[in-house]
């Protein structure tokens, strides 16, 4: 462990889904210019990673350059800290138990009874300190998933309690994000849930240094004093985290409330946050939110419409473009399971995102056909590219039975599999972490929309797929007006397609939304919106 390593631990209380990831990323941003900050997310589920979890249940799966499939909070970490995270930074209980069982089989515990304490907590600690060492970290931001009191995160809570004992109280600070409700009809803020949450944390041996109150309005002085008294913190250490028009306001709000000063005092360090550029971009977002200079309406035609977080990074990509083009983008998620052309008539542009399986498949094809025939700016992502190829094959090339091998029925081969399984996938049976995953180079063809947007002929983008365009059909597609504008580095796999005669009809096999930054929006989203103006 590095000497003078500083650690910030963020826990959540009352309810989940109130923004621990954004809160953690916002605090980390205040320290990123003065310290080498490494964010760590601890998840209590027994999955090795979220790669096989339904997005409707857990939110989108975020893919890293190293091929790791991690929690969506890593999207916030990367975007707020402008770094490329590593899959090892996402510690799941599934990974920990797997390592414990492997160690036991190898005899590393020398015949001792393997127990939750000390063996599991020691493994978590070892993993955390290994990350700090390998990254030469000066500060760790450790976010513990779920809420205090959940059975799933008890061992993570116990681990950070032990870490405090080992590193000393001057090198670690505990931040508790809680929810202060204002029940409808009562019109009064209630502190009792926060009190109970903090008491649960106290029983585990942790006493927060900072309480961040998630609420719809600024806390009243009365509630602030009440929380301070019952939770044993200074009233100045209770921070407002109210509803905002954009999450990029939150680091600025924390800065204005002196979060960095409170934590710096606790850790005996100096920090000088730089928020000028972020403040400028947030100012543009807010001004257009209230008095828009121009409004662009975008349809996101997705199959996981039950949960907005299923497409969180696409939403963020559009926010980044809006800030840089000084306009307002209104995005609407349309369920592709129940989509017809009338749903699309009021939109300036259409996005068809990724997904798996046949559900919602034909609805997406309807959206693609509508965009192509009506010259509406279109961006297809991953499955969106594959379905764009199928739509073109059916409705332009006349291959009416064109389809993907993903829809293959056993013992009934497709006559025209214009999308087929990647060769390296044919012998793979396991589902978890077996796709083409992570950052790969893409070679762009000159004089194409993609080349003009990127300004270079070689780019790195992130992938998550098993299927590809069948090269046997590419000549036919190009004769009919659909070109391949980007290939894999060996020129064997189509990665980008375009229809040059359309204003903007582009689809990519990769996920451009995974590398967007507010200071540097993803190029394909930028091109889409510019085409809509």
From Swiss-Prot:
Residues 304-533 form the Glutamine amidotransferase type-1 domain. Pathway: Pyrimidine metabolism; CTP biosynthesis via de novo pathway; CTP from UDP: step 2/2. One of its GO terms (biological process) is 'de novo' CTP biosynthetic process. Homotetramer. The active site is at residues 382, 511, 513. Residues 1-269 are annotated as: Amidoligase domain. L-glutamine binds at residues 355, 383-386, 406, 466. The keyword Nucleotide-binding applies. Its EC number is 6.3.4.2. InterPro entries: Class_I_gatase-like, CTP_synthase, CTP_synthase_N, GATASE, GATase1_CTP_Synthase, P-loop_NTPase. This is CTP synthase. It catalyses: UTP + L-glutamine + ATP + H2O = CTP + L-glutamate + ADP + phosphate + 2 H(+); L-glutamine + H2O = L-glutamate + NH4(+); UTP + NH4(+) + ATP = CTP + ADP + phosphate + 2 H(+). Mg(2+) binds at residues 73, 143. It comes from Borreliella afzelii (strain PKo). It holds the Pfam family GATase. CTP binds at residues 16, 150-152, 190-195, 226. Keywords: ATP-binding, Glutamine amidotransferase, Ligase, Magnesium, Metal-binding, Nucleotide-binding, Pyrimidine biosynthesis. CDD domains: CTPS_N, GATase1_CTP_Synthase. GO terms for molecular function: ATP binding; CTP synthase activity; glutaminase activity; identical protein binding; metal ion binding. ATP binds at residues 17-22, 73. SUPFAM superfamilies: Class I glutamine amidotransferase-like, P-loop containing nucleoside triphosphate hydrolases. Belongs to the CTP synthase family. CTPSs have evolved a hybrid strategy for distinguishing between UTP and CTP. The overlapping regions of the product feedback inhibitory and substrate sites recognize a common feature in both compounds, the triphosphate moiety. To differentiate isosteric substrate and product pyrimidine rings, an additional pocket far from the expected kinase/ligase catalytic site, specifically recognizes the cytosine and ribose portions of the product inhibitor. Catalyzes the ATP-dependent amination of UTP to CTP with either L-glutamine or ammonia as the source of nitrogen. Regulates intracellular CTP levels through interactions with the four ribonucleotide triphosphates. Allosterically activated by GTP, when glutamine is the substrate; GTP has no effect on the reaction when ammonia is the substrate. The allosteric effector GTP functions by stabilizing the protein conformation that binds the tetrahedral intermediate(s) formed during glutamine hydrolysis. Inhibited by the product CTP, via allosteric rather than competitive inhibition. UTP binds at residues 16, 190-195, 226.
């Amino acid at each position: 462990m590095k000497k003078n390593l500083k650690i910030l631990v963020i826990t959540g209380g009352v309810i989940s889904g109130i923004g621990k990831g954004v809160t953690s990323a916002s605090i980390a941003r205040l320290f990123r210019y003065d310290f080498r900050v490494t964010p760590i997310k601890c998840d209590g589920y027994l999955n090795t990673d979220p790669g096989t979890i339904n997005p409707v249940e857990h939110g989108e799966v975020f893919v890293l350059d190293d091929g790791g499939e991690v929690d969506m909070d890593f999207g916030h970490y990367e975007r707020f800290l402008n770094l490329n995270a590593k899959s090892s930074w996402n510690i799941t209980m599934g990974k920990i138990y797997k390592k414990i069982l492997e160690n036991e089989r190898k005899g590393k515990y020398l015949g001792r009874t393997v127990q939750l304490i000390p063996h599991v907590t020691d493994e978590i600690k070892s993993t955390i300190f290994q990350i700090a060492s390998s990254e030469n970290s000066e500060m760790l931001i450790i976010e513990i998933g779920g809420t205090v009191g959940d059975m799933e995160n008890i061992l993570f809570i116990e681990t950070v309690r032990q870490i405090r004992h080992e590193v000393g109280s001057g090198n670690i600070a505990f931040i508790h994000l809680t929810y202060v409700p204002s029940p409808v009809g009562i019109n009064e803020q209630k502190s009792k849930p926060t009190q109970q949450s903090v008491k649960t944390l106290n029983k585990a041996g942790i006493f927060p240094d900072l309480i961040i109150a998630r609420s719809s309005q600024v806390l009243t002085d009365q509630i602030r004093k009440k929380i301070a008294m019952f939770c044993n913190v200074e009233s100045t250490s209770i921070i407002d985290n109210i509803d905002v028009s954009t999450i990029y306001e939150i680091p600025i709000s924390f800065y204005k409330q002196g979060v960095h000063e409170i934590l710096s005092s606790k850790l005996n360090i100096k920090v000088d946050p730089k928020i000028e550029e972020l403040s400028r971009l947030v100012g543009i977002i807010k001004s257009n939110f209230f008095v828009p200079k121009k409004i662009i309406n975008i349809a996101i035609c997705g199959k996981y419409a039950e949960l907005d977080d299923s497409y969180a990074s696409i939403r963020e990509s559009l926010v980044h473009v809006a800030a840089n083009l000084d306009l307002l983008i209104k995005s609407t998620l349309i369920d592709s399971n129940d989509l017809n052309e009338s749903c699309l008539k009021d939109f300036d542009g259409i996005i068809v995102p990724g997904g798996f399986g046949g559900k919602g498949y034909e609805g997406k094809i309807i959206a693609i056909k509508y965009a192509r025939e009506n010259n509406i700016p279109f961006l297809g992502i991953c499955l969106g590219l594959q379905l764009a190829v199928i739509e073109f094959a059916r409705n332009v090339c006349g291959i009416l039975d064109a389809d993907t091998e993903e829809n293959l029925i056993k013992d009934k081969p497709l006559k025209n599999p214009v999308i087929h399984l990647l060769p390296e996938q044919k012998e793979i049976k396991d589902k978890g972490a077996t796709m083409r995953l992570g950052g790969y180079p893409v070679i762009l063809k000159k004089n194409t929309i993609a080349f003009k947007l990127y300004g270079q002929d070689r780019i790195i983008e992130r992938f998550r797929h098993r299927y590809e365009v069948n090269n046997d059909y590419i000549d036919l597609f190009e004769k009919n007006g659909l070109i391949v504008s980007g290939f894999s580095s060996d020129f064997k796999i189509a990665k980008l397609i375009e229809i040059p005669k359309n204003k903007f009809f582009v689809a990519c096999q990769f996920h451009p939304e995974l590398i967007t930054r507010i200071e540097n929006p993803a190029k394909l989203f930028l091109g889409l919106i510019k085409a809509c103006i």
